[in-house]
Every structure is written in structure tokens, then in C-alpha cells.
């Protein structure tokens, strides 16, 4: 018998489940050099993609991680909600 795949991909650490997400977000673009007004007008934030597990979230931020063991988390990020597409 083939086990049906779960609708949601998750892991369990301790007694808590962490769900896997694709997070699309805007990264700040900075440039310390001299530039014309046209070059400045053409600057845009980079659209980034992060794949990982959601550790927690609130109204201001989302915490994520991509690597883990039985007790610790690594490849961690904290995204301000306003940066997430």
C-alpha cells in the first residue's frame, strides 16, 4: 500500500511541527558609488526567494530556518512582513 503524501510538507522537532514554505521577498539594493539621476531612477530592489521552514511569525516579522538537528536551528532569517511579496 502506498502512503498518501501529506498536503503540507513539515518536520517535527521535539513535539512541535514546522511547515515548509517558499518565501518571496524584496531585498534592499544599495550602491555606494556616484551615479546620474537616470541610473538612480533605475535602481530597484531585488526579488528574492527563500525556501525553508517557518519557525514563528507575528504581525511584524516571519522567522525561518533551512537546516536543523534535534535541538538547534541554522540558516536562519528574520523577514519584516513589509518585505514579503
Task: Give a label for each model feature.
Residues 2-85:
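Conserved RNA-binding domains used in RNP assembly and mRNA/RNA metabolism
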